[in-house]
Amino acid sequence: MTSSAGQRISCNVVETRRDDVARIFNIQRYSLNDGEGIRTVVFFKGCPHLCPWCANPESISGKIQTVRREAKCLHCAKCLRDADECPSGAFERIGRDISLDALEREVMKDDIFFRTSGGGVTLSGGEVLMQAEFATRFLQRLRLWGVSCAIETAGDAPASKLLPLAKLCDEVLFDLKIMDATQARDVVKMNLPRVLENLRLLVSEGVNVIPRLPLIPGFTLSRENMQQALDVLIPLNIRQIHLLPFHQYGEPKYRLLGKTWSMKEVPAPSSADVATMREMAERAGLQVTVGG
């Protein structure tokens, strides 16, 4: 990393990994939008997709990143020797490695909330399937405690990674995106045929799948895309869907990372546009939740 003066800053970040260690970038407590009840959400770092509308750009890279918050900088130049010497906390690590034992201890601090609300733990990302072996072992441990488990995934991985993990879950929040295979490949770098094959597999195996569809102007906010999604879901006897309207909440994160967000000037969907998508899904017999 370089300072504002263009000088190289040492970050002392070691990128070694072990099978019993995950790389995460956040643990969010008291979430009400990522499964039933009060959830503790573990965000895994690393994603194979390049969604232009991504609200968590810090999740894309699998590496630990170091960013500088200009408002906290004292301009003391101590960081030119080592970013860890920053006295004001202007430098921030995005991502950390955590062991199975440590993560188990961390989430079980919230067990009382899980039990009183019917909630539990949700694994999100990034894309949790990029660390599927760890995630599977972790959920196996939580199951021994009787904790409700869920994952949020785009399902774009070999079934051998997805299915064992999904079978440990009370809910799989399955993120659909662009429903045209060519556009999904070109825009998002997604293997849509594999995604849909995995969706059908999960349903056939009795997994509780809850599809989620972002409503993104210019990409997924269209009657055509919605109809393509419904054409997949209805034959599977899926009876609910979450619609997630586009928002600008991620824009400050792009600035923090020194990136330009191509969606910066894109407005949120109008209430009429959201209502149209909702009506299409409801006419098809789906129970609709807007916002997750």
From Swiss-Prot:
Cross-referenced Pfam families: Fer4_12 (PF13353), Radical_SAM (PF04055)
Residues annotated as signal peptide: none
Residues holding S-adenosyl-L-methionine: 53-55, 126, 175-177, 247
Entry coiled-coil feature ranges: none
Single Gene Ontology MF annotation: [formate-C-acetyltransferase]-activating enzyme activity
Domain 4Fe-4S ferredoxin-type: 62-96
PROSITE patterns associated with the record: 4FE4S_FER_2 (PS51379), RADICAL_ACTIVATING (PS01087), RADICAL_SAM (PS51918)
Cofactor descriptive note: Binds 1 [4Fe-4S] cluster. The cluster is coordinated with 3 cysteines and an exchangeable S-adenosyl-L-methionine.
Domain of life: Bacteria
Catalytic activity line of the entry: glycyl-[formate C-acetyltransferase] + reduced [flavodoxin] + S-adenosyl-L-methionine = glycin-2-yl radical-[formate C-acetyltransferase] + semiquinone [flavodoxin] + 5'-deoxyadenosine + L-methionine + H(+)
PANTHER family on file: PYRUVATE FORMATE-LYASE 2-ACTIVATING ENZYME, PYRUVATE FORMATE-LYASE-ACTIVATING ENZYME
Family label: Belongs to the organic radical-activating enzymes family.
Full protein name: Pyruvate formate-lyase 2-activating enzyme
Annotated source species: Escherichia coli (strain K12)
Lineage summary: Bacteria, Pseudomonadati, Pseudomonadota, Gammaproteobacteria, Enterobacterales
